Amino acid sequence: MTLSNTERAIIESAIRDIKDFPKPGIVFKDITTLLNNGKAFGVTMNHLYEKYKEYNLDYIAGIDARGFIFGAALAQMLGVGFVPIRKKGKLPYTTISEKYSLEYGFDEVEIHLDAFSAIPNARVLLVDDLIATGGTAAASVKLINQAGALCVEACFILCLSFLDGYKKLQELTEVYSLVEVK
């Protein structure tokens, strides 16, 4: 399922570009303007609902922090549970974690060990606002699988395709994005 030209235009026009943030030479894609535009947010969420309503999902997993917004909203629309994937040290119960590399070092994400224990072999959709290099998303897919579930697809509002992160992620799961930034 793809966006219509009208839907794509509504979503793209609602995302603000911030030049030189967080450092010179970077153009930051600010989704807060999409979130505070009821029409654009509605078009986004309705499209995701229509795409995923027949996937027989058990959970939506959202990546800290903007993935929580889209993921929790979609989970409610689909009538499934929501599972947060957080930066290390933010979850209160027993967790498993996965490291991933950054430009200068490493970071780590974690999930509750029992996040999917209520449904054996749970079918999970991973959601985040954007995929760039793919490190966080790849670590998140690995966590979902380590926790005993199956990540059936990873979904992003934006894909920065020039960074090739989606290619790395395609080795682990199917990948879908609403808007591609070349």
From Swiss-Prot:
Record's keyword annotation contains Cytoplasm: yes
GO molecular function: adenine binding; adenine phosphoribosyltransferase activity; AMP binding
GO biological process, one term: adenine salvage
EC class name: transferase
Major localization listed first in the record, in broad terms: cytoplasm
EC number annotated for this UniProt entry: 2.4.2.7
Catalytic activity: AMP + diphosphate = 5-phospho-alpha-D-ribose 1-diphosphate + adenine
Keyword Glycosyltransferase: yes
Coiled coil (UniProt feature): none
SUPFAM superfamilies with a match to the protein in the record: PRTase-like
One GO CC annotation: cytoplasm
The family this protein is said to belong to: Belongs to the purine/pyrimidine phosphoribosyltransferase family.
Record HAMAP family: Aden_phosphoribosyltr
Name used for this protein in its record: Adenine phosphoribosyltransferase
Gene: apt
